[in-house]
Every structure is written in structure tokens, then in C-alpha cells.
């Protein structure tokens, strides 16, 4: 089965590289795909300590980068290949006769066009963060404050230290990205006098963010919430709850966030409100999306954060990921839409199932199995208060980034910002004048 991997970044796992300083909740034993391990073992690769928690940088350096350099993958990955659109040759979304026989057309940002018999969309959600506005659209004035708003997971104690030291920061959001940033800011505040922290959330009760504590089967994840709770109770973090941002503006050199008659001011705002999938690039394909989560309709009840935590999501694969457009599948974090209940191991099994189906091994494709650490920390239990989008796309470890294919089986999911295109017919590549 011929294939090509399209990576938008200049190197493997470009999105993870932006938060390489962050430690994952899941130890290595949950982070390495079995098919990827088989390929790496052929190169003399030394497996990391399976009980250790890797950082994003270690995930790249010890796993994803070596994987991308294996003989089976090295010549299959195209870097700097940002996907602009996916459609079918000669067909928009409306036209039907002969549709299934037409190849997919994948157009890159530089005008290059690639034909494919199937497309696995593992683009993730990192490039499409949610907005600060409390109604799902940007707050009034938000777009004009780019220089004062930073995206999730800044390197507070490292390369971004000067931006936060001795200044007031407002962290907006109630997910694990927000918790991680708040803890780093708390450490910075202990080192640098004058460092102030406000935590701005839409909900009324933060038990969901504080999580399972000692009951969490991923101890690092449970400890994260427990430490954050201590920071809030000590007064080092000012918790501003029930705050739905309506507008944002610059006043006397600081950002002013407004919710009704209430105001929050800060030198810098960290947008930790989560992420959402970008379906615009596949707008001409026929998708069956759940109207609430933005996942496939069949997958939605299995991952609903009102009913499930990360570890209680049942095994699922090609059947739940299929769309009315035969041959197109979204896997990984993108497949979950706005649900924050995603784990790396889930994406690995999704991708394995889809690749097995494309190879014609439907028995293997439907033999889906998952062994996940269970906890309530990723649920949106309504007893905890408002179930908003603040945690969307931000659950329980990183979006999957490794790609690995063996004959008929095995694919660790996702090249961030790119698209994995599986081709089982001769490849035709067309270039525009920009190519």
C-alpha cells in the first residue's frame, strides 16, 4: 500500500515542539505505539523507561524523530506541506454520479496537488484554538489584542519568562493546559516579587479541573489538580469564576476583560480555552458530524464528556470514524471534535483500525481494543457546574503525533498541522506555477 505523509511543519511533530517544555500526564508505556516500536527496534533503538513521564521534547527526541527516520518512513514524509483543501477530482459536495470512483485531490498551500484513493486526516486541533469570548465567538475587541494574548502552554519558566516575571497574567480556561500554566506561574511568583496571577473561568465550580486527585490512575494528572487547588486556597492564584468574557480592550497599557459589570485587568492574557477541529479544508467532502461535538455522529455518544472520562471511552475504530465520503477518515484529536476526552492510545488504535480497513483486512479493523487509565478528571459532569468549551481539545496528554505504517497493520496517529494521505493506486502529482 503506497502512502505519503504531509507535515505542515519543517520537522516532525511541529506542534508538540511548541510545548516541548511540558511534561505529559501519561508515562511512556501509554505513549508508544506497538507498530512504531517494531519499526524502531529494527534500528537498534533503546526504549525509554516505561514508567517515566516524558516532556513534549523528550517525546520528539526519543521517539517521534527516530521513528520518522526509519527506512520505512524517512522518504515518505514531506515537510513544509501545509494542506489547503481536500476534495474529489471533478466533484463538489453536491454532485453524486461517479463520485466514489473519482480520486481525492489534496491541494497544498504552495499549489501542489496530489491525487489519492484515500485520505486519513490526522491534522489535530492545535492550529485552531478556541476564542476568549464567552459565547463561542471572539469577544468584542479580541482580534485587536494579538500582541497581548498568548496561546496555551507558554514556556513561563523558560524562553517566555521575561513576559510574565513581575507582571500580572490572566489565564482563561478550565482545562489541563490552564492548570499547567497556572502552576508554572505560581512557581515564577515564588521566585519573582510582583508576579500576579488571575484565573478566569466561565464555570461556577472547579472540581472538574482539580480532578481525581489520588484516585486518578495517572498520578501526575491527579497531582496537577491537587497542586492547583492548593495555590487557589492559599490566595496565590486569584480565582475569578462565572466570568463570561464579552469584550476585551487595552486600558493604560493593560488588557481589560469585561463580563457585565465586572472587570479583570492583566498585562498578558493566556488563552487556555481549548481547541476545535478545522473542517474548512474538507468542506467539499460529505461529512456526517455530530451537531454538538463536531466528531462523527457515530462516535459522539462514545466520547461525550458529560458521560465519559478519558479512560471510560469504549474501544472504537473504522466503523465509528467513517463518513458518507468513502475513503476519508479523521483520526486522533481531530476525530474527537471539541470533546476533551482524548488519549494518545485511543488515537493509535483508531489509526490502526482505519489502515487495516484500507488494506482490506476488515476482521483486524473491527478487532478494536483499548487499555486506558480510568479517572473522572476528564468528564464534564454537570454536577461540577457549567459544562462549557473551556476544556475542549485539552484532555489527558498530548495530541498524537507519530506516524508509522506497516503492511496492512499499524499506524501511530497524527502529524500536527498536516495530513496523512494513504494511496493504493499510482501517485499522480501536479504542480502549479508555485510548485
How would you describe each model-predicted region?
Residues 46-128, 239, 246-259, 265-268:
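Feature captures the FAD/FMN-dependent oxidoreductase FAD-binding
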Residues 129-130, 279-280, 338:
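Glycine/Thr-rich phosphate-binding loops of Rossmann-like dinucleotide-binding domains
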